[in-house]
Structures are given as structure tokens and as C-alpha cells.
Amino acid sequence: MNLFTSFTLLTLLILTTPIMMSHTGSHVNNKYQSYVKNIVFCAFITSLVPAMVYLHTNQETLISNWHWITIQTLKLTLSFKMDYFSLMFMPVALFITWSIMEFSMWYMHSDPYINQFFKYLLLFLITMLILVTANNLFQLFIGWEGVGIMSFLLIGWWFGRTDANTAALQAILYNRIGDIGLLASMAWFLSNMNTWDLEQIFMLNQNPLNFPLMGLVLAAAGKSAQFGLHPWLPSAMEGPTPVSALLHSSTMVVAGIFLLVRFYPLMENNKLIQTVTLCLGAITTLFTAICALTQNDIKKIIAFSTSSQLGLMMVTIGLNQPYLAFLHICTHAFFKAMLFLCSGSIIHNLNNEQDIRKMGGLFKALPFTTTALIIGCLALTGMPFLTGFYSKDPIIEAATSSYTNAWALLLTLIATSLTAVYSTRIIFFALLGQPRFPPSTTINENNPLLINPIKRLLVGSIFAGFILSNSIPPMTTPLMTMPLHLKLTALAMTTLGFIIAFEINLDTQNLKHKHPSNSFKFSTLLGYFPTIMHRLPPHLDLLMSQKLATSLLDLTWLETILPKTTALIQLKASTLTSNQQGLIKLYFLSFLITITLSMILFNYPE
């Protein structure tokens, strides 16, 4: 066992310590939250060792196998894959979880079950790391389902609220649709290749692989909230803000994109799958950016921005640039977690008020939080030399300089400019102008449990992109040369978005619409998607069930087939078998004929 394996397993072992100590009774202690936070910090420091060694030894991949079980011809192993993706993702996920857990100690301090909450967060992180380090599909599936069930428990944490329960069920049901795709792919690989080991699958690489790859795309669409399976992501905002921060930054929502990054050796020569992922990502990034434009819940706006960025990652997968997609996963995690923590600080200080129309003037009341929020919004838009710029700019450059679908490229560029629009809208409504909250509201951000995590993520949102982009192995993403006007495309689209936002703000300050426009309704009602998909199918199902119950069961079986048919059969039988039918005239006629014949016979002379 070498250094990579030992330190990776040590990281996972450190994280499982608070879980294993649950039965000792220490989890009821008031210091349990601080203990869990420190454990995650220790795991973060430990995970830095293999990451640094990997970057300085120029190794490609290291795989550790332990035989687990043999089922007929299938050999299952406990297999850990230490490559660029897993070794770089682990420190990022642990750093962000460490910050979120410290923030949770402030945000959830009055919750009676806060220790259980921390345990759930830790399990959420562990299952994500299992997924990231897995080298076979069975192990990956354990992590995949683990993040799914933990998201259900965390989104529905406030189980006394109906909306939270509905959102948790929605998340689990949409993810079950994606799980069908993953299970179908696993079944195909098992029946056709007799293996779930990733390296063997890549070596065999049969053609065509459209069916299993479409299953993987469906799985990624469910887990990473692509268009069609996206409504659960904004609904997940019903959970506590630390859950939203962890869910949307470095864990569950990027699991689908990470799955496709893992399987890129199978996808890189399959044009059909690349086109599907490109178009799906382009539609997602534009649709969710449009939906974010008119939302008034600050967490919903940030949630839709997450979905839009996931669409951009899917576009990058479609461009056959998995390393750029992974870079955007890591950089996006920093500023997205910080945006959620800043929104949580504002919501907590304003007594759980999430409507940006009831905020305003917070720049002076919460100077540190609002500064971090502005930098996070600028990083989200891809402002030069912030973290988002180092991943977003190369993605736009790769899209504009590749032989790709111009339609998908246009949608992506429009969505990029809209990112600047809704980011500016958050700044205008929440931070600037006159205060629109009650004057008696007590506002205080001077708490180290609040300031320190945001401060760490703020540093990450400024410098992490530079560090991560310089750590990409040079043999995977070659340097691109392009004309100056293409090089400036991403910056031009962001600038255009800012200009549009400022112009709209200036033009509509004193403008009142009697009736909302159709485009406003489309954006506010989320493209009518929840209305149609969450109401029409249940309505049709209930209507069909009612028709089946009344027409088929009640009228046909319980009325026509059983009672009426039985009565009719009995009537026919009694009619046929009865001697007396009540026909008086016929009886008299038969008597007459009988008497007449008798008289004729008796009176006939011999």
C-alpha cells in the first residue's frame, strides 16, 4: 500500500470516526458539532498530502484493489481510483464542508437535533467521497444512492413543514428516474462485458455503446437537474441553508456531471452522445437562467444559477472537454457555497425573510456579508481574475473555437449574459437602495462562526481558480490559439449582461405595467413546467383511475356482468323450463282441439 492509497483511506477513516462513535453517547454532547467540524478539518489537511504529491510526481492514475466477493463469473472488488479527478476533488469538497459545518454551528444553534444534523451532513460528504474514489460501478452506485437518500433526509429536515416534505419527495422521485438509467447501464455492462470495473470497461470499449451511454446521460440528467428533470433543484431550497450550500456546491448536484467525466473515454468518440449532452446542457443553462430572472426568493435565484452552471458543465462534456468541466465543478463550488452562506446570513438576520423585495440597504448594515455576496456574484458571472473566470472563460473559448452546433453555442452565450443580469438584480434589490425591512430588526454579523467560513470561501473565490487552473496536467488540455474577438467573447457577453441589467433598472424604476407580459409569466411560472408536469399527469391519472373504477369495475363487473347477467340467465332458464306460461287463449284452444279430436274419434263409425 503506497502513500496515495494510505492517505486516501486515512481521510475516509477520519471522517467515519464521529459516525462510529454515535453509539457511545458522545453525539448528545454539546461539543459534538465542534468535534465534527475539527474532524473534517483534519481530513482536509490529510487529503492535501496525496493531492500535492500527485501534482509533483506527474503520475496519471493509481488503482488499489481488494478482492471482495465472487459471484459466478463476476468478481467484485473494493477498488479505489486515485487520479486527477478524485485527488483534486477531495480537498475541495472537504474545505467547503468544513466551512459549511462551522457556519451551521451559528445558523442551526437553536435546533434541538443539531447533532443529528451534523451527522447527516457528514454522511452526505462520506457518500460523495465514496462516489468520487470508486473504480467500479457497484461501489459508485453505493455512493450514488447514498447522496440520494441523505439529500432526502436533509431537504426534509424541517419535517413539520408540508413544503419541505414535498420538496424531499420531489428530489427522491426525480432522482429515481435518473437511477433507472444508471441501473440499465450497469445491467448492460454486466450482460455484455461481464464486468463493472471501469478500467476493463474502457479497455473493452465495444461499439456501439449508445444504450449504456444514454442510460448514463439520463442518470446525470436526474442527479444534476438537467432540463426535464430539473424542478427538484429549486424545490430543495425548502431545506436549511447549510444543506442548500452543501447540496449545490460540492456534493450531490455535481455527482451526475462527475459520472460523465469518469466515463469520458467511452464518450469521446461517440458523436451522438456528445451532441445529446451538448444540446441538453445548452437548453438547461438558458432555460434556468431565464427562470432566475424574475424570481424574488434569494435562495431560489441562487438555486437556478446552480442549475444554469450545471447546464454549462454539461455543454463542456458535450464539447469533449472533461477536464474543463471538472475545473468548473471545483471553482463553482467555492463561490456558490459562499453565495448560499451570505444569503443564509441575510435571511437569519432578517428573521427568516427570503424575499429580495423586502430587503434593501443591507450594504451598510451587513458590510462584510454584502461584500462577499458582491464578489461571489462577480465570480459567478466570470469577472476577470476571480475564480469563475478561470473555468468559465476557457469553456466559452472552447465552444467558440470548436466545430460545434451553432444553435447550442448561441444558447450558451445568451445564458452567460443572463447570468450577469440576475446577479446584478440580487445586488440591486438586496443590498442597495433604501431599507425595506422593519426598522426594529436586529442585525448583527459579528460572530466568528459566521465570519470565518465566509472569509475562507471569499479567499477561495478569489484565488482558487488560479491555483486549480494551473494544476491541470498540460497533456490533457492543450493550449488554444484563437483570434482576439473570440478570446473576448466571454467577457463581452458578461459585460453585455451588466449593461442590460443597468438599462432595465434605469428604464423600469418609474414604469408600471397593468398586466404582466407573457415573457414575464413564462419566467415567473418557471416555463409552466411544474404546472404542466406536476398537475396534468396526476390529473389524467386520477381521471383514468376514476373512469376505470366507475366504468370498468362498477358498471361493467359489479352491475352488468354479475347481477344483470345472472338475472337474465335465470329468466331465460325459467322461461324455457316452465310448463305454465300464462297463455289462456292458447290453453283454451288446446282444450278445444283435444275435445274436438276426441269427439271425432269416439263418434267415428266402425
Curated annotation (Swiss-Prot):
On whether Hydrolase is a keyword of this UniProt record, the answer is no
The UniProt entry, under Pfam families, shows:
NADH5_C (PF06455), Proton_antipo_M (PF00361), Proton_antipo_N (PF00662)
Localization, UniProt: Mitochondrion inner membrane
User: Transmembrane ranges?
Assistant: 1-21, 35-55, 87-107, 114-134, 140-160, 171-191, 211-233, 241-261, 272-292, 301-320, 325-347, 366-386, 413-433, 457-477, 482-502, 582-602
Topology term for the membrane: Multi-pass membrane protein
Q: Is Chaperone one of the keywords UniProt gives this record?
A: no
Functional note: Core subunit of the mitochondrial membrane respiratory chain NADH dehydrogenase (Complex I) which catalyzes electron transfer from NADH through the respiratory chain, using ubiquinone as an electron acceptor. Essential for the catalytic activity and assembly of complex I.
How does this polypeptide assemble, per the annotation? Core subunit of respiratory chain NADH dehydrogenase (Complex I) which is composed of 45 different subunits.
What protein name applies here?
A: NADH-ubiquinone oxidoreductase chain 5
* The species this protein was found in: Balaenoptera physalus (Fin whale)
